[in-house]
Amino acid sequence: MRHTRRNIFYHELIGLRIKIIEYPDKSLVGLTGLVIDETQKTLLIETNSGRRVRVLKANGVFQFMLPNKEKVIIRGVQILGRPEDRLKNIVR
């Protein structure tokens, strides 16, 4: 199944380009990079300079770039939970 705007919640986010649109720590707003790890509550982002930043999903609004170059904005609370649990839900 391809990544689309409608089914991104069920896909693995690791490997997608990301930009932080809103976040309580204003120094992180605008940060761009690649999602290199995901847990139930966090995303680990590697910036273009190689810096790694872990952010809480629930606190932010993120823009993901899908493999087809489409940009999707998602509130972090929509992607809370372990990635494997989100993937299991699509099978049910």
UniProtKB/Swiss-Prot annotation:
It catalyses: Endonucleolytic cleavage of RNA, removing 5'-extranucleotides from tRNA precursor. SMART domains: POP4 (SM00538). Keywords: Cytoplasm, Endonuclease, Hydrolase, Nuclease, tRNA processing. GO terms for cellular component: cytoplasm; ribonuclease P complex. GO terms for molecular function: ribonuclease P activity; RNA binding. Its EC number is 3.1.26.5. It is found in: Cytoplasm. This is Ribonuclease P protein component 1. Signal peptide: none annotated. Consists of a catalytic RNA component and at least 4-5 protein subunits. Belongs to the eukaryotic/archaeal RNase P protein component 1 family. GO terms for biological process: tRNA 5'-leader removal. InterPro entries: RNase_P/MRP_Rpp29_sf, RNP1, Rof/RNase_P-like, Rpp29/RNP1. Part of ribonuclease P, a protein complex that generates mature tRNA molecules by cleaving their 5'-ends. It comes from Staphylothermus marinus (strain ATCC 43588 / DSM 3639 / JCM 9404 / F1). The lineage of its organism: Archaea, Thermoproteota, Thermoprotei, Desulfurococcales, Desulfurococcaceae. NCBIfam families: RNaseP1Mthb (NF046110).
